[in-house]
Amino acid sequence: MANDPLEGFHEVNLASPTSPDLLGVCDPGTQEQTTSPSVIYRPHPSTLCSATIQANALNLSDLPTQPVYSSPRHLNCAEISNISIHVPEPASSVASEVAAGLTRFTSRKDSCNAEREFLQGATVTEASAGNDDIFGLSTDSLSRLRSPSVLEVREKGYERLKEELAKAQRELKLKDEECERLSKVRDQLGQELEELTASLFEEAHKMVREANVKQATAEKQLKEAQGKIDVLQAEVAALKTLVLSSSPTSPTQEPLAAGKTPFKRGHTRNKSTSSAMSGSHQDFSAIQPIVKDCREADLSLYNEFRSWKDEPTMDRTCPFLDKIYQEDIFPCLTFAKSELASAVLEAVENNTLSIEPVGLQPIRFVKASAVECGGPKKCALTGQSKPCKHRIKLGDSSSYYYISPVCRYRITSVCNFFTYIRYIQQGLVKQQDVDQMFWEVMQLRKEMSLAKLGYFKEEL
């Protein structure tokens, strides 16, 4: 079985992956071997040339044991057409077998020629497309076997696209987060701007209101200060008058003008009847004593004043002021309306009391609180029905109290005393020594004593 010939081995090589064809046979005459580039497996030339070739028959011993790879050659159509198969002349002993074999071989040759023509057409087609390699199909098959498959390429491309898509999605997510963060920042800045604007407007309105209130308060204080200035100017003028009148250098009596006789009270007697008594009258006037005003300070009171002068204070508990409070101030400001009298004393001490002349103000313009406190026909301190030419105001109160002339004089005498000792406390009295200050205080106490006894001066 092993030596049985195999027919058609030159056409199909079972060991070849590319199904090569045997296109050339060794010529015994020239010993030239023509091998087609498409033949991958071929028998050795020595075997083909030495052995007798039987038509369409091969022995197993003639098969190659190793694959023979032909070097790549670039053949054109002309070379392919010149390829021929040379068969040696058969021996005479086997003429009959050769004839039958030739018949079969001729049919095989025709089929090979048809296959060669088909390959030539395919080669020409590839050459017209720009490919000169006659073994393009074989090379492409090998390249497909060596290169990755289409599925792997697609999978790699799909993976790369997935990676790029994931990267783009990550970038888009980052962009969205950045946009969201910027939107939050924008909203926060807008809210802060609105709050700041609202606070600025509120602060501006608050400042305007405060400015208006301060302006109104300043105007009110200005009016009150102007009223106080007028009152103080009147008090200063009164104090100047008191100082000038109590000064020892001021004349107490002006000399009579020349040629004028002094006014005599009573009736005049007849000259005839009075001439007899003239001598006795002159003797009586001669023996009448001359009277002058004299003064002497109380030593204890003077020492108390000197002690107070060294450290002046408005505290009523000090010995000097306590005695004046008990002897002059309290009796002078004691009225039937005790509550109002206490308020008047407190206002005098705080220097917040103001006195205004009523003038010819109609009753319809008088405030209701002032009318309730007595009105211009009734004194608010004594409760007596007397014409009231002045009214007082206590501190920042809007109420006015109408007072009679005697009450007004009693209040002004106490105000004059407090004004003078305030000047001493503030160091404004510098032109007088301690004795002059003491006697000025005594003069003010005298006025308070006269006022509490009912003596007063009224302006006509």
From Swiss-Prot:
Instruction: State if Amino-acid biosynthesis is listed as a keyword.
Output: no
- What GO terms describe the biological role, i.e. biological process, of this protein? negative regulation of filopodium assembly; positive regulation of cilium assembly; protein localization to motile cilium; protein targeting to membrane; protein transport
Q: Return the annotated region ranges for Disordered.
A: 246-280
Modified residue annotations for Phosphoserine: S147, S149, S247, S250, S272, S280
- Coiled-coil regions listed: 149-244
**GO CC terms on record?**
centrosome; cytosol; lamellipodium; nucleoplasm; nucleus; perinuclear region of cytoplasm; proximal dendrite
Q: What is this protein's tissue specificity according to the annotation?
A: Ubiquitously expressed. Expressed at highest level in testis.
Cite a single GO MF annotation. GTPase binding
Tree of life domain: Eukaryota
Write out the biased-composition intervals (Polar residues): 271-280
> Sorted alphabetically, which keywords does the UniProt record give?
Cell projection, Coiled coil, Cytoplasm, Cytoskeleton, Guanine-nucleotide releasing factor, Nucleus, Phosphoprotein, Protein transport, Transport
The subcellular location is: Cytoplasm; Nucleus; Cytoplasm, Cytoskeleton; Cell projection, Lamellipodium
| Role played | Guanine nucleotide exchange factor (GEF) which may activate RAB8A and RAB8B. Promotes the exchange of GDP to GTP, converting inactive GDP-bound Rab proteins into their active GTP-bound form. Mediates the release of GDP from RAB8A and RAB8B but not from RAB3A or RAB5. Modulates actin organization and promotes polarized transport of RAB8A-specific vesicles to the cell surface. Together with RAB11A, RAB8A, the exocyst complex, PARD3, PRKCI, ANXA2, CDC42 and DNMBP promotes transcytosis of PODXL to the apical membrane initiation sites (AMIS), apical surface formation and lumenogenesis.
Q: How does it assemble?
A: Homodimer. Interacts with the N-terminal region of SSX2. Interacts with the GDP-bound forms of RAB8A and RAB8B. The interaction with RAB8A is prevented by phosphorylation of RAB8A at 'Thr-72'. Interacts with the GDP-bound forms of RAB3A and RAB3D. Interacts with DCDC1. Interacts (via the N-terminal region) with TRAPPC14; this interaction mediates RAB3IP association with the TRAPP II complex. Forms a heterotetramer with RAB11A where RAB3IP homodimer binds two RAB11A subunits.
Q: What family is this protein classified in?
A: Belongs to the SEC2 family.
Name under which the protein is recorded: Rab-3A-interacting protein
